[in-house]
Amino acid sequence: ASGSFAGRRGLRLSKVEAQIPDLTHTVVAVNADARGPLPELLALMTTSPLGEMTGNALAQATGAGSANLQLHLSLPINDLRQSKVQGSVTLAGNELRITPDTPALDRLRGVLQFSDTGFSLTNVQAQALGGPLRLDGGMRALAANAPATESAVQLRAQGTATAEGLQQATQLGLLSRLAQRAKGSAPYT
């Protein structure tokens, strides 16, 4: 089947499949693919139960370009609070800003895997701060006895920043102003 999400006409659903594999334990399994503008996909992720299930990790994100979504849901009819989500967003040259105070990621390529327990990035590539960037890592559930200093989000960014790129990243405040007098580039991790 195919269709669209209510209120998200730019997102086109395809390969939609719903099934109940076992009638004695009523769990609806839903699989679907979607394609459309990244801003609509981000809005869907933050305004639907997907936002809560993924810890609202993209609540402030903005973006441009088209993206693909693959979605797998497991919905126990008798207790929807126990629902499971798994999916991926494929980016192919998009622009993304995670929060208003972070630099834009341009020409973003890669796959963001997500589930009800977190998300992961593997070899995601972009342009940021005037140079190439590679991102790996993600967010995972912490053990109940984890120290308060341990973060659920662990990302590794490796790239090159240029003086011009830092100058243009006005959301970085003082660093951007200091870069007005700089030249060249430097690697970072």
What is the role of each PLM region?
Residues 2, 16, 23, 101, ...:
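Surface loops and adjacent helix of pleckstrin homology
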Residues 25, 105-107:
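Short "repeat-start/strand-capping" segments in structured domains, especially the N-termini
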Residues 1, 23-80, 84, 88-92, ...:
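Extended amphipathic, helix-rich lipid-handling scaffolds
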